[in-house]
Design a protein with these regions (language model features):
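Bacterial N-terminal signal peptides that target proteins for export
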Residues: 1-4
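Acidic, metal/ion-coordinating pockets
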Residues: 8-333
């Protein structure tokens, strides 16, 4: 009798245990055009590429999160730097990523194979962080990172829905975004001990704020899964809306974090981005996204600093008008 009562006490205590809360920061494209790399070279005294100053203005938002996720769109490859249309980015970008406070990065994009499998390999080697979306082997492709955050175990899964038509070295080199594949990988992560998954998708139509029909369809299907808690996305190079789909947050497009895109070549909004700050609660292995705050960002020229957009500025108003406001969603103060 005493043992039974003790067991019940343990069970009730676990049920009554307060939930833990944590914040995940997710940001937009690192799109390292030639002029951005040239600024990093200047910041490095002309001897090395130092990208750290570009991100110092937003460091508190990245380092201040419990988990920070970045999106490396272009391959990190030693040797001559190349910009658009076939990128080769200095590997020292990875040093800036780590110094700014990002904890893991997605690497699946339409530029993942700009330098072939070699570029995939050198990117992963340079990052020295958990990554998802590209792989050096079939085994690596099957093992998405599971990240520990305040006792919760979060799988990070990344995929691209778009490519530039490059030859694919191996079936496992880049993770392609199909609903069945994504759901399979999310379930596999659950079997490996993950409580839930955050899915990063490189998707949508370039320079369009509108959510495409294919984005809507994929978001609806994925958010029906109990194995997925939230979706974040990039590729459009402009901000896209943040919505609740099946009661889960979907950040359809975070815009560019850093690039050389301006109104001179592209929409003025290509200088805009956002850092999504998703607040989760975890209790007894159940993880749920409760609310989203976001930091509108802007790429300042000519020094390419990524700065929080001034409240009420043209950039801030553009981003807020697209990203949206709701009881669970608002720009951060």
């Amino acid at each position: 009798m005493t043992a039974a009562l003790a067991a019940l006490g343990v069970m009730w205590a676990s049920q009554l245990a307060p939930p833990t809360s944590f914040t995940v920061a997710a940001s937009g494209d690192f799109l390292i055009h030639g002029p951005v790399a040239a600024q990093a070279l200047s910041d490095g005294g002309g001897r090395r590429y130092d990208f750290r100053p570009l991100f110092r203005p937003i460091r508190r938002h990245i380092a201040g999160a419990d988990l920070a996720l970045c999106h490396v769109e272009t391959p990190l490859v030693p040797g001559p730097v190349q910009g658009y249309p076939s990128f080769r980015t200095p590997p020292s970008l990875a040093q800036a990523i780590r110094a700014t406070g990002w904890d893991a990065c997605s690497t699946a994009s339409n530029h993942s194979l700009d330098a072939g499998q070699h570029g995939v390999n050198t990117t992963i080697r340079a990052l020295r962080l958990p990554h998802s979306g590209t792989a050096r082997s079939a085994r690596g492709a099957r093992r998405a990172p599971i990240l520990r955050v305040k006792g919760a175990r979060i799988a990070f899964l990344a995929f691209t829905a778009v490519s530039n038509g490059q030859a694919v070295p191996h079936p496992w080199s880049v993770a392609w975004a199909g609903a069945r594949r994504i759901l399979r990988d999310a379930r596999r992560a659950r079997r490996r001990g993950a409580d839930t998954a955050i899915v990063n998708l490189h998707w949508g139509d370039e320079y369009s704020h509108a959510i495409s029909p294919s984005q809507w369809a994929l978001a609806r299907r994925l958010t029906r899964s109990p194995a997925i808690a939230a979706i974040v996305g990039q590729h459009a190079h402009v901000v896209q809306p943040i919505r609740r789909v099946n009661d889960k947050p979907v950040v359809f497009g975070e815009g560019n974090l850093v690039s050389n895109q301006t109104a001179g070549c592209c929409p003025a909004a290509s200088q805009d981005g956002l850092i999504a700050l998703i607040r989760f609660t975890a209790r007894n292995g159940r993880v749920r996204a409760r609310r989203v705050r976001y930091v509108p960002t802007w790429v300042r020229h000519p020094d390419y600093r990524v700065v929080p957009a001034a409240r009420g500025s043209v950039s801030w108003r553009r981003t807020v008008a697209v990203a949206g406001r709701a009881a669970w969603l608002r720009p951060a103060r």
